[in-house]
């Protein structure tokens, strides 16, 4: 019998509908339609087999290192095989439950939820939840076991306690392994036990079934059949087998005696199983499913209520109290507009019922301010005057023309989304505060599902197939050399979940235990607990997420602010900085942006002179412009040409003008593409947001296909057809998936301006702030200090009598800190600073309590030269000095050093770079005379070269970068003593030149491309520069 069926309007089934499906009678409201699955968009048919059957012990790939397929694929297979219901069982968790629920709801397939509990390594208890109450009880039990143990250890209570705590809210699925000890069976309530006849097609099935038969006759337990599948078909079963071998740290050949002959079992419907087991066992599976199935439409916890009688009145009071301080120095016109806007925003917040959300965000931000932690709201919160007044954001929305409706409107579903960037060195303190304030049960971080990428997939595929680790590691970096079998298995693993990680900063906060909705467990990082879902599943369940993100530039800005106070006595408030200083924009237009947030990359430095920003919105554009979305959508060059008056502003269709007017007809921001969906295809705001989320999700193929059909239908209603329709869809796909939201661009643009402001007005403090916040940004300390020298700043070397632990500003110069010296830890550096100054090395050793290794590190770095000894002499004295103790007479163990020659310039640079990563000059400077004889020009001369001229260029490699949007082309960053240069390396040259891949300093022959104030070199030959290995500070390679 064949029929088609879908859910009602894609929504989860009601109980009456669900019961009808389980009993074989199909409600009238079901549509005859295509259903389910996650394939390529082809139509899927739902079959009903002649033998009813519900698979109640299947595993998706969220049973980590066990299952082979996604929940969507498992649901599709169940539908195609005519199953009455499906249970996807994870180990010690509900990792894939929400994805499973969403896929099944779309397909109209009833769902059963459960988990395997690891009571002991050889004792696994499978539990099926009966309805919402059973799900909640099981989630709490898993949480208790996870939190009682550690990241990799789960500690459940004794079996009797599990049975008691679950009561009648579950069914215990017991296979043959539970029947060998009848004392265990006595612990269960008889009416909660279901014996599981595994139909695995292995010879031992016969013996297992005979044992189950005997127990069934003796106790009268209910019994069902199950294929126990961990794959959708035989091909995928091999992948599941490989994963299961990896889980046991074995190869497939080693694990073969314990694995299924085909690797694993796979999905089989009732008709196929009917020849292997009693029909009653198949019928009983439907009965158990009817007893347990429910739609996972959980009632998510609310946000904690703020402890005040009236949350809205409290929020209004906070805004009124802080208004004057935040708007100090603004014009009366701006103040009046801000007051009116606040009245409007508070009305919307009240109407939508979100005052509690703003109070929680304000609480977190206030903690940061109270504890001198720099933070800033990111995203569309920058459009809100309320957020600005509360101190959540630092961009004043009235003067910058930002629209509140892009942040919050009456059409929006769910709470607003405020991401909080926090200086990276203090983010842990903020997260700890959230745990302490809201409770470990009610607050947790969001998970990040770690999936297989190419290298890891190749490595694990090789290990699974029995190859040694050395081969696995080699093939992970050179995939073409791997055997076909390894590459085939790796390709199947790619994109699949491997284990659970932790989101960069997402936290959920609830008014009751999160375990009512999803289990929590310990993260790898000490003191962190995470929910078992990623941000998409949390959003689907209605859990409210707060993003607390670490940002290195905020840490650097904090250092800059503190340094300005130290050097000038002036306190800088970021929100009071004038965003319209022409000098700042001139500096950026000249490409002078090394160290400036977000615009210091190779591509950004090449774009700035072309765009020539003149106002704040230009920086917003600059942040969004050099991104995969605009690049793939072909927007970068058209926008710049139009911005500079070299190309007319046009629109591909008149209906697009409203969405694209502000960016001259060229789509740049993610929101614009959503507006196109609204204007051109008639989407609602909610549909446009659903489209955005679907395109950004790895699991929304079906939703994307549905939205695509809806989009083209909407275009036809507006008479937009043919090529234009296809172009619009392609732009949306490129931008919504990879484009940068304007709301984020606004927030990041403020940090661009703030950091550029410090570079222009307080350059020494700027560079020292960056040094203190390392590692961060695009450039190494060596490149940052070279840029400082080009600004005619003086760099003072490490000095045990003058250096502090970190870099400092000393009379307008940059003094390097002791923490930059390799081999000198923070404790040793603090001891050196605390007891300074020193008379000699022995004095240093005694009073600072330093060992031989630390003194030798100081000697090699030149930090001891202030004592009147060269580096070689200091190394000679280090051993003897370190043997002196504080109680000994000074000089008792000193050995006179012989007369040793000082280091030459080359040796000093080598020693500096080896010990500190920075040198007093660029190594290439030592070769300049020889290079000039060969016709090699300095980087500073590139802008003076004629376009298309062939030149020679030499430099230290600062970066190797191969963006996904560059079709395999690699970009080298080179630096000599005069500046930076960008070198373009073709795919062919990269393949045939070893130097371009590994050399630390290179000599390049190539052709200059010089236009619009930007010069680059396209290389045709690359060779290693002499002595490069010893002279280079190393490169920062990006792939």
Curated annotation (Swiss-Prot):
CDD domains noted in UniProt: DnaE_OBF, PHP_PolIIIA
Any GO CC annotation of this UniProt entry = cytoplasm
Whether Iron counts among this entry's keywords is no
Q: Which reactions are catalysed by this chain?
A: DNA(n) + a 2'-deoxyribonucleoside 5'-triphosphate = DNA(n+1) + diphosphate
Q: Please name the InterPro entries in this protein's record.
A: DNA_pol3_alpha_NTPase_dom, DNA_pol3_finger, DnaE2, DnaE2/DnaE/PolC, DNAPol_HHH, PHP_dom, Pol/His_phosphatase_N, Pol/histidinol_Pase-like
Per UniProt, which keywords does this protein have? Cytoplasm, DNA damage, DNA repair, DNA replication, DNA-directed DNA polymerase, Nucleotidyltransferase, Transferase
Localisation: Cytoplasm
The domain of life for this entry's organism is Bacteria
Enzyme Commission number(s): 2.7.7.7
Q: Does the keyword Transferase apply?
A: yes
Gene3D superfamilies from the xrefs?
1.10.150.870, Metal-dependent hydrolases (3.20.20.140)
Q: Name one GO molecular function term.
A: DNA-directed DNA polymerase activity
Q: Name one GO biological process term.
A: DNA repair
Give the protein family: Belongs to the DNA polymerase type-C family. DnaE2 subfamily.
Xref: HAMAP family? DNApol_error_prone
Q: What does this protein do?
A: DNA polymerase involved in damage-induced mutagenesis and translesion synthesis (TLS). It is not the major replicative DNA polymerase.
Instruction: State what protein this is by name.
Output: Error-prone DNA polymerase
- What lineage is on file? Bacteria, Bacillati, Actinomycetota, Actinomycetes, Mycobacteriales
Name of the encoding gene: dnaE2
């Amino acid at each position: 019998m064949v029929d088609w069926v879908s859910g009602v309007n894609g929504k989860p089934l009601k109980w009456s509908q669900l019961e009808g499906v389980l009993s074989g009678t199909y409600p009238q409201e079901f549509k005859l339609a295509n259903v389910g699955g996650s394939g390529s968009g082809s139509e899927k048919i739902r079959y009903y087999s002649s033998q009813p059957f519900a698979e109640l012990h299947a595993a998706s790939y969220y049973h980590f290192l066990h299952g082979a397929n996604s929940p969507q694929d498992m649901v599709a297979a169940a539908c195609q095989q005519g199953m009455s219901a499906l249970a996807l069982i994870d180990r010690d968790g509900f990792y894939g439950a929400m994805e499973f629920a969403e896929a099944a709801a779309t397909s109209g397939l009833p769902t059963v939820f459960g988990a395997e509990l690891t009571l002991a390594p050889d004792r696994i208890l499978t539990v099926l939840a009966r309805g919402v109450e059973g799900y909640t009880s099981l989630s709490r039990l898993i949480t208790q076991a996870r939190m009682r143990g550690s990241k990799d250890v789960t500690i459940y209570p004794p079996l009797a306690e599990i049975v008691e705590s679950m009561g009648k809210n579950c069914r215990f699925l017991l296979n043959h392994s539970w029947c060998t000890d009848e004392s265990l069976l006595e612990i269960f309530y008889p009416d909660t036990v279901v014996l599981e006849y595994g139909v695995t097609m292995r010879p031992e099935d016969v013996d297992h079934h005979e044992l189950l038969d005997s127990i069934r006759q003796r106790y009268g337990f209910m019994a069902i059949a199950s294929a126990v599948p961990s794959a959708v078909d035989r091909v995928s079963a091999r992948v599941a087998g490989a994963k299961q071998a990896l889980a046991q740290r074995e190869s497939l050949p080693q694990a073969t005696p314990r694995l299924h002959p085909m690797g694993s079992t796979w999905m089989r419907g009732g008709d196929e199983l009917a020849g292997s087991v009693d029909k009653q066992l198949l019928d009983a599976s439907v009965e158990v499913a009817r007893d347990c199935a429910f739609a996972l439409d959980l009632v998510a916890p609310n946000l904690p209520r703020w402890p005040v009688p009236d949350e809205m009145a409290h929020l209004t009071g906070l805004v009124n109290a802080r208004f004057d301080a935040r708007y100090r120095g603004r014009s009366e016109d701006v103040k009046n507009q801000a007051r009116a806007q606040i009245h409007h925003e508070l009305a919307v917040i009240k109407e939508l019922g979100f005052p509690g959300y703003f109070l929680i965000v304000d609480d977190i931000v206030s903690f940061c301010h109270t504890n001198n932690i720099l933070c800033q709201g990111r995203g569309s919160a920058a459009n809100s005057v309320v957020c600005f007044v509360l101190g959540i954001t630092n961009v004043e929305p009235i003067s910058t023309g930002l629209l509140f409706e892009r942040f919050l409107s009456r059409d929006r579903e769910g709470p607003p989304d405020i991401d909080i960037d926090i200086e990276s060195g203090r983010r842990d303190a903020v997260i700890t505060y959230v745990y302490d304030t809201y409770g470990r049960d009610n607050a947790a971080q969001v998970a990040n599902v770690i999936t297989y990428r190419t290298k890891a997939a190749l490595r694990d595929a090789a290990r699974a197939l029995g190859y040694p680790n050395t081969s696995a590691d080699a093939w992970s970096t050179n995939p073409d050399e791997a055997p076909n079998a390894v590459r085939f298995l790796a390709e199947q693993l790619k994109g699949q979940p491997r284990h659970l990680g932790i989101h960069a900063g997402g936290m959920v906060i609830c008014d009751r235990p999160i375990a009512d909705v999803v289990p929590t467990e310990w993260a790898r990082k000490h003191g962190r607990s995470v929910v078992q879902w990623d941000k998409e599943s949390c959003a689907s369940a209605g859990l409210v997420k707060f993003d607390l993100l670490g940002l290195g530039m905020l840490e650097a800005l904090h250092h800059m602010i503190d340094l300005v106070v130290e050097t000038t006595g002036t306190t800088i408030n970021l929100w009071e900085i004038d965003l319209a200083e022409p000098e700042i924009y001139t500096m950026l237009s000249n490409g002078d942006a090394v160290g400036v947030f977000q615009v210091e990359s190779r591509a950004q430095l090449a774009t700035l002179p072309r765009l020539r920003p003149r106002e704040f919105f230009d920086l917003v554009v600059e942040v969004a412009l050099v991104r995969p979305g605009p690049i793939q959508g072909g927007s970068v060059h058209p926008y710049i040409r139009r911005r500079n008056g070299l190309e007319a502003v046009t629109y591909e269709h008149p209906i697009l003008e409203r969405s694209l007017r502000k960016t001259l007809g060229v789509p740049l921001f993610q929101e614009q593409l959503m507006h196109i969906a609204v204007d051109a295809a008639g989407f609602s705001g909610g549909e446009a947001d659903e489209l955005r989320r679907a395109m950004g999700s790895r699991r929304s193929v079906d939703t994307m296909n549905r939205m695509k059909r809806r989009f083209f239908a909407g275009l036809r209603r507006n008479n937009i057809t043919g090529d234009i329709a296809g172009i619009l869809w392609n732009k949306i796909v490129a931008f919504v998936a990879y484009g940068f939201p304007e709301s984020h661009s606004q927030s990041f643009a403020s940090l661009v301006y703030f950091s550029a402001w410090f570079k222009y007005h307080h350059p020494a403090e700027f560079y020292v702030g960056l040094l203190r916040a390392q590692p961060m940004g695009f450039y190494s300390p060596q490149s940052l200090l070279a840029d400082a020298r080009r600004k005619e700043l003086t760099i003072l070397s490490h000095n045990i009598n003058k250096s502090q632990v970190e870099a400092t500003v000393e009379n307008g110069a940059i003094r390097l800190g002791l923490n930059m010296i390799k081999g000198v830890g923070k404790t040793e550096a603090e001891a050196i600073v605390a007891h300074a100054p020193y008379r000699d090395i022995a004095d240093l050793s005694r009073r600072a309590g330093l060992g031989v290794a630390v003194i030798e590190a100081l000697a090699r770095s030149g930090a001891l030269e202030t004592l009147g000894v060269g580096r070689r002499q200091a190394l000679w004295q280090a051993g003897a000095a370190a043997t002196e103790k504080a109680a000994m007479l000074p000089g008792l163990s000193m050995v006179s050093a012989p007369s040793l020659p000082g280091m030459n310039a080359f040796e000093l640079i080598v020693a500096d770079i080896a010990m500190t990563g920075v040198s007093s000059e660029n190594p290439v400077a030592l070769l300049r005379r020889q290079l000039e004889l060969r016709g090699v020009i300095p980087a500073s001369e590139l802008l003076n070269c004629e376009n298309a001229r062939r030149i020679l260029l030499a430099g230290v490699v600062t970066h190797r970068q191969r963006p996904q949007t560059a079709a395999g082309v690699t970009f080298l960053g080179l630096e000599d003593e005069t500046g930076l240069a960008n070198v373009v390396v073709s795919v062919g040259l990269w393949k045939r030149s070893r130097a371009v891949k590994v050399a630390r300093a290179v000599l390049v022959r190539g052709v200059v491309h010089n236009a619009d104030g930007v010069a680059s070199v396209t290389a045709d030959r690359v060779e290693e520069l002499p002595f490069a290995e010893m002279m280079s500070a190393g490169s920062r390679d990006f792939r």
